[in-house]
Amino acid sequence: MKPNIHPDNYRTVLFFDSSANEGWLIRSCAGTHGKTMVWTDGKEYLLFSLDTSSSSHPVYTGKQRNVNTEGRASKFNQRFQSVMSSFRKDK
């Protein structure tokens, strides 16, 4: 292996998914902007915040929603049917 090709800031980082309230300690060189968090072992680690991970993403959790676009269109038409009929009478 070539010497001096690896990053100098390779350290243990806490990746924390705030929506699932779950975290993982991983060695990484990801930028953390100096944020820290005390983990369950009582030690303070650099923090990398995640919005979504495999613990919270609907594809991985099985809580996926199917959107019925036909139902949405019919609800829209029902709500504004009276408005459209009065508009047509005026012309």
Curated annotation (Swiss-Prot):
The keyword Ribonucleoprotein applies. One of its GO terms (molecular function) is structural constituent of ribosome. It comes from the Bacteria. Keywords: Ribonucleoprotein, Ribosomal protein. GO terms for biological process: translation. SUPFAM superfamilies: L28p-like. Coiled coil: none annotated. Part of the 50S ribosomal subunit. Belongs to the bacterial ribosomal protein bL31 family. Type B subfamily. NCBIfam families: L31, PRK01678.1. This is Large ribosomal subunit protein bL31B. It comes from Neisseria gonorrhoeae (strain ATCC 700825 / FA 1090).
